[in-house]
Curated annotation (Swiss-Prot):
It is linked to Atrial fibrillation, familial, 15: A familial form of atrial fibrillation, a common sustained cardiac rhythm disturbance. Atrial fibrillation is characterized by disorganized atrial electrical activity and ineffective atrial contraction promoting blood stasis in the atria and reduces ventricular filling. It can result in palpitations, syncope, thromboembolic stroke, and congestive heart failure. The lineage of its organism: Eukaryota, Metazoa, Chordata, Craniata, Vertebrata. Phosphorylated. Phosphorylation and dephosphorylation may be important for the function of NUP155 and may play a role in the reversible disassembly of the nuclear pore complex during mitosis. Disulfide-linked to NUP62. The inner channel of the NPC has a different redox environment from the cytoplasm and allows the formation of interchain disulfide bonds between some nucleoporins, the significant increase of these linkages upon oxidative stress reduces the permeability of the NPC. It comes from the Eukaryota. One of its GO terms (cellular component) is nuclear membrane. Its main location: nucleus. It comes from Homo sapiens. Essential component of nuclear pore complex. Could be essessential for embryogenesis. Nucleoporins may be involved both in binding and translocating proteins during nucleocytoplasmic transport. GO terms for biological process: atrial cardiac muscle cell action potential; miRNA processing; mRNA export from nucleus; nuclear envelope organization; nucleocytoplasmic transport; protein import into nucleus; protein localization to nuclear inner membrane; RNA export from nucleus. Residues 985-1012 are annotated as: Disordered. This is Nuclear pore complex protein Nup155.
């Protein structure tokens, strides 16, 4: 038991969490008890048979039949069967015996509650319950040899023919129909009135010859097959069908012992001189589809009818000698004469045992158990017949005082009960009853026995078909439900005692096999009260907890006839139910949980497993000395860790609380009431056909009748607990609890030198601690009983309505949840589901225009824990809301909606907010959505813990704050979801009503209430305005976040609220999506003309290290920041703003270079992974020029970018600059190598012009001399046009005088390169081109400079002519000389 439940009894104000924990603990107790009830042993385990090849024997030990030994006086006088009720034969029948000539037989047909008698060729039937309703058939002329009642095959006869009566004579087999006028459907019980009961149809349905086969017995299977036993030792079957076919007759006889075609060959005079072994008995196991036969000589044969019951094959045959030999080898000390003859065989169905299939009873009362297949294989087909156990009857143990059975001539075995009719003398029988109902969990098997005298010879002995409660097997519990039926003690609260009928010539003898509860009732009535030695012995025999559970069946009975017995049972419950105890660790073995039943109390060397309710064989051992322990049950650790428990007084750290029999009896009884449904699925899916469609419906897994029965039992238990609230106090009628405290502290070791007074106080404290723990547990169980009753009452109410429709109203998720929910879950933890089911039920009323007040009051009456006053308010509000849908008057509709809103607001913290808001949306009551959601948020978090949690950074350790925060957000979500719906609708593409989707008449819109785009937009604006009025800061924040999320930032920026700026600032600092919030923040500042703040936010955005922002966006942010900064400086003249603007402009310059680097890398090296990483890096942040140069421009050899960086930095290094220009030119030439010469010249010219225009104004970064020289060398090398460089420089805008100066210096430098290239006149050609351009267009030089430049040109030409004259004459020299002389003349004309 958790420590939280040990402090004190649960007060009314106990928290919901503590109540829930108590319920969970109570549920676990029930789970454990239910599991223990289901762990009953199989018959093979009771018989200690582990496998077919390991046979065992029992019956020779005193403990096999505890009542046969000297312990008899210690056991209460418990009758096993009720007093016998004798019903004489109808007087008309007695007269018929005088007319008998050949033969008479008698038997019972339990399915129709009839006994039958044949006298020669006539058969009579009557109701054996009262001797009335006598019917007869005298339509046969031959003596009747065998009689059988058959439930016919389906679909062959008319529905009123419920059974067939099969009669066999020496000549033919006649099949008659039985119909019933007043048969109760499904009950199998005939109406007792003489006028309207059974009718025997006069004309036979079938008649076929016996072919001279003497038939001895007739039996049928549940599926309508008819088997007959022949005196010739053969097994026959009558096969019948509706109509004859080409190769089959309507009715024919098949001999399964010889040939399937034997009906074609008559057996003439077969039984006249036969030495065959007649078959005396046929037994059919309908649960496994196996048929057994027993012959006159004791041969047992096994036939497999197939998995589906339609086959037929003989699989085994064992002779009586083989059986006797096997039994003798198993029970070697027993005289073999008791093993034969076998007088009866009985099937053991799979509801009783999975491993044992057949029981044979001998004339001495010995039971022989057989198996037909390997153990633990429930689906295996029979393949053998193996004797696995020999059970001797009472009287074979050494100390037995009971006389052994003898001369058994008739036996009946049914569900563990063996009845044997033994001949006492010629006129009378002794009826033996042997069973293990008292000890169903005890291994090896222990049985009780009793005998009763029977007047007359027993002609027939039969069990009356009992009421059977169907197991509720569902997907959730199918693996936990045993295949075999629970013992009687587990089911006795809901099943009546088993009924038997014995027929003799004097009439029918009716009696019941008493259940333990019937035996207890007998003791209470006999003792006229709840006290007495016999009752105390009953409690010791069954153990306190099991006896208390049995006692509760009577104590909780609400029947008027049980009122006095109920009071006696209550007294016995409290008197003998024990007390809670504290068990201490001890060096002695723990006390057995077996009470002193037949002798002195003893300690068991190992306690019986918890929940094992029956005695341990050791209870007849040597008595031990010491405290006599009352019966105990599963202990619960009360204090500390059991591992630390000690045995002395100085360190009692780990005692265990052992609950009383009263406590455990209540648990057991409750678990047995609920056991059939506790862990079953609430619902099952069933598929049925509607026309050609298959429809899946969800139905209750438990029928109403069973619910009614469970509710009746639960109500009795609940009233008992409410009536006897003192059960958690001290022992009844024993106020002096301290006197016996030490007896309740099991294993407590008295300290040698302890203070007696101190020890007594400690003992008293421990005892009260155990009492308190039990009281708390019982209160939890009481609450569980109450909740269970109310949950099942609700479930029954749902079943009485249209359950399938109610469930269909649920949301799909809840329907799926329903499929995986057990009744236990529904009771303990599924309040949401019960609420939804109730809401669905009420909605069905509302939909049918029925008032909900009546059903609401009924719900409050039957399940107030599930349907409170608040729930009733909710139902009323829901009714108003639903009724408003029907109202056409706008004012009235608004009034009803307003009224519903007021009702909902009363319980807004409990209402299904999303559902109500969805309905408000449907009726366009958007104001209600906002108001109800905000009210709900306030009620769920009245102290504002959610906002506190949010503002303090959402600390993980603040669980309460987190819960309040989530509750508020869930409430706000209803508003934002509604806004979202309106947004979506306002943007939806309107459908053109003029264009039909398909041919035919116009189709109405599927939703006539759908909003138009304009209406949706209007409602959105109205709702947004209403939302903005809220003073709820956390809601405002939620609204802002939603607007951002759905890209309605423009709407957000229109909000005039004091909460907006702090929220954006906060989110820009802490949210993972900082970029988005900073972007909104600068826009907010800009909109509110706070330009300085906008510029600084934009600057932070540009500087932010983030992969969300591209480099291009960063440049845009800086550009926007510069604009805002300029606007700020225009408004105010703060020096800091001016400095900030300067910083922004410098930042922009560097950023552009960074962009240039990135674009260059993307353009030239995009396929390299390292380049891709570099490009991403350049996107992630703004870098300084040092980093750009060292980490990007230089490593990737980006000459242009390096030139831009040193230009930006103002760094002057002529050699570096020249190298960069050379790299730029060479890179461009390299990139264009595949192009034609003209294209290459064009590409290079574009590049030089582009860069020249940037750097020509700063000669340090545009070394003209070097560039012209390098370019001319490339032109010379590539044989390009002579004027290429001059044209390029002209496009850059280099002045002609400066260009002439450069070329003149190049020529005069006499670089050997030109001679090496064999073009010594190249530069003169270039100068000639340059000057010709001037002559042709003198305006290239300013007018004021023109004369001086012309003179300069003439002087230079003269110099060039002198140089040419000094050169050796050649065609090229002569040509250039002529060109310069012509030029000279033109220049002189310009002079």
């Amino acid at each position: 038991m958790p420590s939280s439940l040990l402090g004190a009894a649960m007060p009314a104000s106990t928290s919901a969490a503590a109540l829930q924990e108590a319920l969970e603990n109570a549920g676990r107790l029930i789970d454990r008890q239910l599991q223990e009830d289901r762990m009953y042993p199989d018959l093979s385990e009771l018989l200690m048979v582990s496998a077919p090849n390991n046979p065992t024997v029992s019956g020779m030990s005193d403990m096999d039949y505890p009542l046969q030994g000297p312990g008899l006086l210690s056991v209460p006088n418990l009758p096993e069967i009720s007093s016998i009720r004798r019903v004489p034969l109808p007087p008309e029948l007695v007269e018929q015996f005088g007319h008998m000539q050949c033969n008479c037989m008698m038997g019972v047909f339990p399915p129709i509650s009839r006994a039958w008698l044949t006298i020669d060729s006539d058969i009579f039937m009557w109701n054996y319950e009262d001797g009335g309703d006598l019917a007869y058939f005298d339509g046969l002329s031959e003596t009747i040899l065998a009689v059988g009642l058959v439930k016919p095959k389906a679909g062959i006869f008319q529905p009123h023919v419920r059974h067939l009566l099969v009669l066999a004579t020496p000549v033919d087999i006649v099949i008659l129909g039985l119909s019933y006028a007043n048969l109760q459907t499904g009950s199998g019980v005939l109406n007792d009135s003489l006028s309207g009961g059974m009718q025997l149809l006069p004309d036979p349905l079938y008649s076929l010859p016996t072919d001279n086969t003497y038939l001895l017995t007739i039996t049928s299977t549940d599926n309508g097959r008819i088997f007959l036993a022949g005196k010739d030792g053969c097994l026959y079957e009558v096969a019948y069908q509706a109509e004859a076919g080409w190769f089959s007759q309507r009715c024919r006889k098949i001999n399964h012992s010889k040939s399937s075609l034997s009906f074609l060959v008559p057996s003439l005079l077969q039984f006249t001189f036969s030495e065959d072994d007649p078959i005396l008995q046929i037994a059919i196991d309908n649960s496994r589809n196996i048929l057994y036969t027993r012959s006159e000589k004791g041969v047992i044969q096994v036939y497999d009818l197939g998995q589906d019951g339609q086959g037929m094959s003989r699989v085994a045959s064992v002779s009586q000698n083989a059986i006797v030999s096997a039994a003798g080898n198993i029970a070697r000390t027993i005289d073999r004469s008791v093993f034969k003859p076998i007088v009866q065989i009985a099937v053991i169905e799979n509801s009783e045992s999975l491993d044992c299939q057949l029981l044979a009873v001998t004339h001495a009362g010995v039971r022989l158990y057989f198996s037909t297949c390997p153990f633990r294989q429930p689906l295996a087909r029979p393949n053998t017949l193996t004797l696995v156990h020999v059970r001797l009857p009472p009287g074979f143990s050494a100390s037995s005082t009971v006389e052994k059975p003898s001369k058994v001539h008739r036996a009946l075995y049914s569900k563990g009960i063996l009845l044997m009719a033994a001949s006492e003398n010629e006129d009378n029988d002794i009826l033996w009853c042997v069973n293990h109902d008292t000890f169903p969990f005890q291994k090896p098997m222990m049985e009780t026995q009793m005998t009763a005298g029977v007047d007359g010879h027993s002609w027939a002995l039969s069990a009356i078909d009992e009421l059977k409660v169907d197991k509720i097997i569902t997907p959730l519990n199918k693996d936990h439900i045993p295949i075999t039926d629970s013992p009687v003690v587990v089911q006795q609260h809901m099943l009546p005692p088993k009924k038997f009928v014995l027929l003799s010539a004097q009439g029918s003898l009716m009696f019941h096999k008493l259940r333990p509860v019937d035996q207890l009732r007998h003791l209470l009535v006999s003792n006229v009260g709840g006290d007495g030695e016999e009752i105390e012995r009953f409690f010791k025999l069954h153990q306190e907890d099991q006896a208390c559970a049995t006692c509760l069946i009577l104590a909780c009975s609400t029947a008027a006839c049980d009122r006095e017995v109920s009071a006696w049972a209550t007294r016995a419950f409290f008197r003998y139910g024990g007390e809670a105890q504290m068990r201490f660790p001890t060096t002695l073995p723990p006390p057995s949980n077996v009470g002193p039943i037949l002798g002195s109390p003893v300690y068991s060397s190992s306690p019986v497993p918890s929940g094992s309710p029956y005695p341990n064989p050791s209870f007849l051992g040597t008595p031990s000395h010491g405290i006599q322990p009352p019966a105990m049950s599963t202990p619960v650790c009360a204090l500390g860790n059991p591992a630390t428990q000690a045995t002395n007084m100085s360190c009692v750290t780990g005692p265990e609380i052992v609950y009383s029999g009263k406590h455990n009896g209540i648990c057991i009884y409750f678990s047995r009431i609920m056991g059939n449904i506790w862990d079953a699925s609430l619902v099952v899916e069933r598929i049925f056909k509607s026309g050609n469609r298959e429809i899946t419906a969800i139905e209750s897994s438990v029928p109403c009748q069973l619910l009614e029965s469970v509710l009746q039992e639960l109500k009795g238990l609940q009233e008992f607990l409410d009536r006897n609230s003192q059960f958690a106090g001290g022992p009844l009628g024993n106020p002096n609890t301290t006197a016996k405290v030490q007896q309740r502290l099991i294993g407590f070791m008295r300290p040698e030198n302890g203070n007696p007074q101190q020890m007594q106080q400690e003992l008293q404290r421990k005892f009260h601690e155990a009492q308190l723990s039990e009281k708390i547990s019982l209160q939890a169980i009481q609450q569980l009983v109450r909740k269970s009753y109310q949950a099942l009452a609700l479930w029954k109410l749902l079943c009485e309505h249209q359950f399938t429709i109610i469930v269909a109203e649920l949301q799909k998720e809840l329907q799926e949840q329903l499929k995986i929910t057990t009744f236990k879950d529904l009771v303990i933890r599924d309040k949401e589901l019960t609420g939804a089911l109730i809401a669905s039920l009420i909605n069905c009323y509302i939909r049918d225009n029925a008032a909900v007040d009546g059903i609401s009051l009924h719900l409050q009456d039957i399940c107030p824990l599930l349907y409170s006053t608040d729930d009733a308010i909710c139902s009323k509000a829901n009714e108003l809301l639903q009724r408003s849908r029907q109202v056409q008057n706008k004012t009235e509709k608004e009034r009803m909606l307003r009224e519903s809103l007021k009702e909902y607001q009363k319980i807004s913290n409990q209402v299904d907010l999303s559902n109500v808001c969805a309905q408000y949306r449907q009726v366009r009551f958007y104001e209600g959505v906002v108001e109800l959601s905000l009210t709900a948020a306030e009620k769920k978090d009245p102290q504002g813990l959610g906002l506190h949690f949010y503002k303090h950074g959402e600390p993980e350790e603040d669980i309460v704050g987190l819960q309040a925060f989530q509750e508020r957000l869930n409430s706000y979500k209803c508003i934002t979801d509604t806004l979202q719906e309106l947004v979506n609708q306002s943007k939806a593409a309107p459908q053109s009503p003029s264009v039909p989707k398909k041919p035919g008449p116009p189709v109405l819109s599927s939703d006539p209430n759908m909003l138009s785009n304009e209406e949706a937009g209007h409602h959105f604006e109205q709702m947004l305005k209403l939302s903005q009025r809220s003073k709820d800061e956390l809601f405002s924040i939620a609204l802002y976040n939603w607007l951002i999320q759905v890209d309605l930032a423009d709407k957000l920026l229109q909000v005039a609220s004091p909460f907006l700026e702090p929220h954006l600032v906060r989110m820009a600092k802490v949210d993972q999506n900082r970029v988005r919030y900073m972007d909104l923040l600068w826009r907010y500042y800009e909109k509110n003309r706070s330009f300085s703040n906008a510029a600084r936010v934009l600057s932070r955005l540009a500087d932010m290290h983030s992969t969300e922002i591209s480099l291009q966006q960063r440049l845009e942010y800086i550009a926007r920041a510069i604009l805002s900064a300029k606007s700020s400086t225009a408004i105010s003249s703060i020096a800091a703003d001016g400095e900030f603007l300067h910083e922004l402009e410098e930042k922009m310059e560097v950023a552009r270079i960074q962009l240039q680097i990135q674009e260059t890398l993307q353009r030239q090296y995009s396929h390299h992974s390292s380049v891709q990483d570099a490009v991403s890096q350049l996107d992630s942040e703004l870098m300084d020029i040092t980093k750009l140069y060292g980490e990007f421009a230089d490593p990737f050899k980006l000459a242009e970018c390096k030139l831009a960086i040193i230009h930006c930095a103002g760094y002057s290094d002529p050699i570096l600059v020249q190298t960069l220009w050379q790299d730029i030119i060479e890179k461009e030439l390299s990139d264009s190598v595949t192009l034609s010469s003209s294209d290459r010249m064009h590409a290079l010219s574009l590049k030089i012009v582009l860069l020249g225009k940037i750097y020509a104004g700063t000669p340090r970064f545009f070394p003209l001399d070097f560039i012209v020289q390098f370019l001319e060398q490339q032109v010379c090398t590539l044989n390009w046009d002579v004027g290429f460089v001059i044209q390029t420089m002209n496009e850059i805008g280099v002045p002609l005088p400066r260009l002439l100066e450069v070329y003149d210096q190049l020529f005069k430098s006499r670089d050997p390169f030109w001679n090496r290239m064999k073009k010594p006149l190249h530069l003169l050609d270039c100068i000639h081109v340059l000057l010709i351009r001037y002559v042709e267009n003198p305006s290239q030089v300013l007018n004021c400079e023109r004369r001086r430049f012309t003179n300069l040109c003439l002087d230079a030409v003269c110099g060039y002519l002198v140089e040419l004259q000094s050169m050796s004459s050649s065609v090229a020299v002569q040509a250039i000389t002529g060109n310069f002389k012509s030029l000279q003349a033109k220049l002189e004309r310009l002079h």
